[in-house]
């Protein structure tokens, strides 16, 4: 309510008082989010409208610039469509190969199979930290460490986890 009454202006676009106030509030929010999730620098925070838009942004910017035919992306079988469809579209466009970490009967990721998939030298491992369907909390630290050891970068869909568990 306060913003709409007293600071309603475009951010980063004006030198008048309302624009400067709106920009200050926006950048304060960026710093608050960075602190909340343990980011090293507030400049690491990019605001998007939602998870789908954020992952599409990565897929169509980083993905198009860095992936080519035959490259491998590892996902999990428990992904929400926001972390599945962009990679499927990119795979079709670029002839990139998608591989999936299976889910065990008790709703956990099969980490032994994950380690086998890493032998395919993936460029990217993209996974949900907390499944919105199963409620499973995946071992993000271990998944990331193993991916980095294999030379892959990681994308963590933290939309479900950030409000519920500490992240960094």
Show which residues each predicted segment covers.
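Pyridoxal 5′-phosphate
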Residues: 1-168
């Amino acid at each position: 309510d306060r913003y709409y009454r007293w600071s309603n202006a475009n951010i980063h676009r004006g030198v008048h008082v309302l624009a400067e106030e709106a920009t200050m509030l926006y950048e304060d929010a960026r710093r608050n989010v960075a602190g909340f999730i343990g980011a090293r620098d507030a400049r690491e925070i990019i605001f998007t409208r939602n998870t789908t838009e954020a992952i599409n942004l990565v897929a169509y910017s980083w993905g198009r610039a860095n992936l080519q035919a035959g490259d491998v992306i590892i996902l999990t079988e428990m992904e929400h469509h926001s972390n599945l469809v962009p990679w499927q579209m990119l795979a079709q466009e670029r002839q990139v190969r998608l591989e999936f970490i299976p889910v065990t009967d008790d709703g956990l990721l099969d980490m032994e199979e994950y380690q086998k998939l890493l032998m395919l030298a993936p460029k990217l491992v993209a996974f949900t930290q907390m499944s919105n369907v199963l409620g499973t909390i995946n071992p993000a630290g271990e998944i990331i460490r193993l991916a980095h050891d294999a030379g892959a970068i990681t994308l963590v869909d933290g939309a479900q986890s950030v409000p519920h568990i500490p992240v960094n």
